[in-house]
Amino acid sequence: MMPLLDKLREQYGVGPLCSELHIAPSTYYHCQQQRHHPDKRSARAQRDDWLKKQIQRVYDENHKVYGVRKVWRQLLREGIRVARCTVARLMAVMGLAGVLRGKKVRTTISRKAVAAGHRVNRQFVAERPDQLWVADFTYVSTWRGFVYVAFIIDVFAGYIVGWRVSSSMETTFVLDALEQALWTRRPPARSITVIKVLSMYRWPTHSGLRKPDYWHQQEVQATRMTTRWRRASMVFTKRR
């Protein structure tokens, strides 16, 4: 507000401007005096100005990720005696905030379910396209939280034929990745798609999948596969 009054005071005068803003002219002149004579400010105001510089220094030296608690503790380690509430108040005035740590996400939910038998016996080799599909389910930590990714790879060419990203660990978006692969590759009818049951949740029946017209004769069965990595994975095999 003060820069605006300084800009318009020559044109309209201090009195009319303060009247429109419902403030006393003495308030404006008092602020002007404090700006031009910092030594005449109150002891608390002068200390706040000094603390702001120290807070800004600690904040910048720590990659601008420290919050109130860590800034306060760092100031105490440096011998600067200040209350935590004072640091919180000044950081709010300065518009400084620490980076929030995301809450811990439970990535594996074990459930007792009947596991299907093996179909490929870890022989991840294909003689032709769309003979064997390998799918995986993983998660990525971002500033906004966890993002879950499901993708399906054709073993013959190592090409991703379907993928989906979701902010929640639900089965529907994994089915969407499978459906995208089916629409993209359009495998021949009467082929068998073999799906591994995810360890994070129970794989549903294929009745929940929206079937395209050309896929009405396909049969979906479940199988189980163990990978070298401790993460969920799936296998899709197609038979001529």
Swiss-Prot record:
The domain of life is Bacteria
List keywords of the entry alphabetically. Answer: DNA recombination, DNA-binding, Transposable element, Transposition
Q: Name one Pfam family in it.
A: HTH_21
- One example GO MF annotation: DNA binding
Q: Which InterPro entries match?
A: HTH-like_dom, Integrase_cat-core, RNaseH-like_sf, RNaseH_sf, Transpos_IS3, Transposase_IS3/IS150/IS904
- The answer on whether this UniProt entry bears the keyword DNA-binding reads yes
Which residue numbers delimit the Integrase catalytic domain? 125-240
The processes (GO biological process) annotated in the record are: DNA integration; DNA recombination; transposition
Q: What does this protein do?
A: Involved in the transposition of the insertion sequence.
Q: What's the protein called, per UniProt?
A: Transposase for insertion sequence element IS3411
